[in-house]
């Protein structure tokens, strides 16, 4: 399992398929945002005074993330997206 550092967050993207004229199009290929589930969260970042600022998200949260943000990584058979917390736009409730 991936353990993110600092303010980084590991996400599992929810893939949606869309059919147009019999062709399957990746659902997120043209969207500005993606929906994802938080898998793991780093400890946060430190301020200039050394105070630790904890992340706003936690494992299990469903979030909205910028479409082209982060780095795709593989862990075994699973593919995850590793992003900075700043790339997460909202928690979906």
UniProtKB/Swiss-Prot annotation:
SMART domains with a match to the protein in the record: Cpn10 (SM00883)
Cellular location(s): Cytoplasm
GO biological process, one term: chaperone cofactor-dependent protein refolding
PROSITE patterns found in the cross-reference section: CHAPERONINS_CPN10
Keyword Magnesium in record: no
Keywords: Chaperone, Cytoplasm
Similarity comment: Belongs to the GroES chaperonin family.
Protein name: Co-chaperonin GroES
Organism: Streptococcus gordonii (strain Challis / ATCC 35105 / BCRC 15272 / CH1 / DL1 / V288)
Gene name for this UniProt entry: groES
